[in-house]
Amino acid sequence: MDGDIIFPVVVKPVDNAGGRGMSICRNREELSEGIAKAMQFSDASTPEIEEFVEGLEVFVYYIVRNGVPTFSMASEIATMRDSERGMPYHVANRFPSHQIERIRRECDEAFVRLIRSLGIQNGYIGLQCFVTDDRVMVHDPTFRIDGANDHEVAKMITGVSDVEFYIAHALTGTFGTQEDAGKLHYRSDWPIFIQVGSILGPGIIGEFSGLDDVANIDGVYEVEQVRRVGDEMKLATSTLSQIGAQIKLQAPDSQTLRVRLQEVFDAISVKDVNGADMVVPLNLDELAFGKTQDK
């Protein structure tokens, strides 16, 4: 089997999610360890081996009404890795993705054909993609309300959301109105929204402060404390397990977003029981400007 595998690869359980049981493997020894780990996290004791793609993870959203798909949004998941082999931490969701114009230009026609070929008449479709310098690869389509709460962002920008469309369809049989559907069509002048986590390293939390100050920063519209004093942070068991707090904020442009992100992380203080800083520093330039840091 190994002779047919081009490393690196991702090994994961076929029936789990959120990064649980996943490993990045770069040789045969790591592959054997990754398979054993994946089987431990799989009810079916079955591992899945995939190509490891080094690229951006982007969600592309389409609203479909009466059989007509229309490009709505593309968001981006920002991650960081704890080690050479560790699965990435989920750091942030950014609306829109830095790659949104490229994806709309290069992929819209193909994505519309795909959705039409499936015979979907009404709904909000998410296409999870890996984006590299030379390709955009769809690897997980979803036909549900997304866990990134993109409907909240849509509501704040346009006054309507896909959740309201689904409720209307359940009650009346009509998937919203054409006028409201038009409001969910992407426009390049929409502001930037980001949901970012304060990532914590291993240790027992002895002090957690600053979130009240964060709530008063311009653009911040929601703050949620996920971990509390006394909680023990261990090595990552899933992509979300290291988040100490979630902050949601908006900004009119990337420069303003960068300033506000700095204010947020300057305000947050988390120390372990020995007084050591537990907050893992993030690359705020990448969150604001993208990996090219084209300012």
Where are these regions (language model features)?
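Protein kinase-like catalytic core scaffold
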Residues: 9, 70, 137-140
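ATP-dependent carboxylate/phosphate-activation module, predominantly the ATP-grasp catalytic core
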Residues: 20, 29, 51-120, 124, ...
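Active-site nucleotide/adenylate-binding loops and adjacent lid/helix of ATP-dependent enzymes
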Residues: 1-47, 54, 65-67, 93-109, ...
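A short glycine-rich, hydrophobically flanked beta-strand micro-motif that places a catalytic Asp/Glu
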Residues: 50, 121-133, 178, 279-284
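Peripheral (often C-terminal) accessory segments that flank ATP-dependent C-N-forming ligase machineries
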Residues: 167-295
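A short, glycine/Asx- and small/polar-enriched loop/turn
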Residues: 5, 131-137, 238-243
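A short linear hydrophobic-aromatic micro-motif
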Residues: 8-10, 45-49, 178-180, 221-224
